[in-house]
A protein has these predicted regions:
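C-lobe/activation-segment region of protein kinase-like
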Residues: 180-257
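A short, basic N-terminal segment
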Residues: 2-27
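Short glycine-biased active-site loop of nucleotidyltransferases that positions the nucleotide triphosphate
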Residues: 99-107, 176-181, 203
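Catalytic cores of glycan-processing enzymes that make or break glycosidic bonds
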Residues: 236-255, 277, 288, 333, ...
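Conserved ATP-binding subdomain of kinase catalytic cores across diverse folds
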Residues: 19-125, 130-134, 146-154, 264, ...
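Conserved protein kinase catalytic/activation segment
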Residues: 165-188
């Protein structure tokens, strides 16, 4: 390979692993004497894609055209900056005979985009083949709906929204106690058609959703119907489910943004993760009540951002501390203090709507405990009374929480 015809735009940490690969040869012609291939299942792609292992890293390499290689690499980087789940680009490579000659033939050029191989990521099509159950499909559709909602919330038009263009990855996260949990997330794996807009239009949103629905129809046709679990699929129900999950997540993202703008509080910093927009409504209502309380105490109007910080420090954090002291995990399994608090707030919100009046935090805790704890009634009753007694020391008299 004559390196004077090589353009290697690769991140420095990966450069030594990639610079001596056979970039002057079409990817389909690479052989195991030149590189170490990884035997990894891959999804449907219109481009040649190979997975390789170098001394220090594992990569996915896709052969494409020069413009697409550059555009995709830059787009992946921009998506990551916006917090979108997508591939991590290592860079792109061009190889062209007579690179600097004015009349060089375009067909003599080769272009590649290189991304870091995602550990524990699986193409949707493989997961469907393993398990085409209702639960499996809906888990994937929910992850894909959240990905699409995140894109649209950030004014990004996908252009080719499709099951074929996502990877499903199992990722680990930690709660406030450091307890690990595994979540399934969808990662955008092809950014060739991505457009980052100033404002995304309704037409763009509808087009992406329609395109994704078409891919659901296509994947349904791709699988044989001899399996009863596959023949009983209600595609219309699947589409409704996807649309509803998209709507829920898009509304949640807007609700979070509105809450953070109003209160100056960061959801992730204080509450780790909220998946229910009604929890946010309930928390905002508490902050507004705290604002009213502080204004009454001071005799003048208190700013809501000041009230929000006061509420965090003097109401919310002390309550979370009491939850931890009382070992609430013994009574509510698979939870943590922050999640329990937001779940109780959502429960309070629903019950208040149902009864047509604010039921208050004490009634909400009693009701939630009876509904969601598997402890026997006498033990649970003692726990709840002990908790409520401690909360009265935190919450001021005549304070509506």
């Amino acid at each position: 390979m004559d390196k004077k015809y090589l353009v290697l735009n690769i991140e420095q940490e990966y450069r030594s692993d990639l610079e001596n690969l056979p970039w002057d040869t079409p990817l389909i012609e690479w052989n195991d004497k030149q590189v170490k291939f990884l035997d990894i299942r891959k999804g449907i792609s219109k481009h040649t894609v190979r997975f390789i292992k170098t001394k220090n890293f594992a990569f996915a390499i896709k052969q494409t055209n020069p413009i697409s290689a550059y555009f995709e690499s830059e787009t992946f980087a921009k998506l990551l900056q916006k917090g979108i789940h997508t591939l991590i680009p290592a860079g792109y490579v061009f190889y062209k005979n007579n690179l600097f000659e004015k009349n060089a033939e375009e067909k003599e050029s080769l272009a590649f985009i290189v991304t870091i191989l995602e550990a524990k990521s699986i193409p949707h099509s493989i997961l469907f083949k393993w398990d085409f159950s209702d639960t499996s499909r809906k888990t994937i559709y929910k992850a894909a709906a959240e990905l699409l909602a995140n894109l649209h919330f950030n004014n990004i038009f996908w252009g080719d929204a499709s099951l074929s263009n996502i990877l499903i990855k199992f990722i680990k996260s930690q709660d406030d106690r450091g307890k690990s949990r595994t979540e399934l997330k969808a990662f955008l794996s092809d950014s060739e058609t991505i457009q980052i807009l100033k404002t995304i239009s309704d037409d763009h949103i509808k087009k992406d959703i329609r395109c994704f629905n078409d891919s659901m129809i296509a994947i349904n046709k791709d699988f044989p119907k001899d399996d009863k679990s596959k023949s009983d699929i209600d595609l219309n129900e699947d589409k409704k489910y996807f649309k509803q999950e998209y709507k829920n997540h898009f509304e949640l993202l807007n609700k979070i943004a509105e809450f953070e703008k109003t209160t100056g509080l960061e959801i992730q910093k204080h509450f780790f993760k909220i998946t229910d927009q009604y929890s946010i409504d309930s928390i905002l209502k508490q902050i507004e009540e705290h604002k009213w309380y502080l204004s009454e105490q001071s005799g003048s109007e208190i700013d809501i951002t000041f009230a929000a910080n006061e509420w965090i420090e003097n109401i919310y954090k002390p309550i979370i501390k009491e939850f931890n002291k009382l070992k609430i995990f013994d009574y509510f399994i698979n939870t943590n203090s922050v999640k329990l608090y937001t779940d109780i707030m959502a429960h309070k919100y629903y019950l208040s709507i149902e009864r047509g009046e604010d039921i208050g935090i004490y009634s909400a805790i009693r009701s939630y405990s009876e509904k969601h704890s598997d402890k026997e009634e006498s033990l649970l009753s003692k726990f709840v009374e002990k908790l409520l007694k401690r909360l009265t020391k935190i919450i001021p008299p005549n304070y509506n929480l």
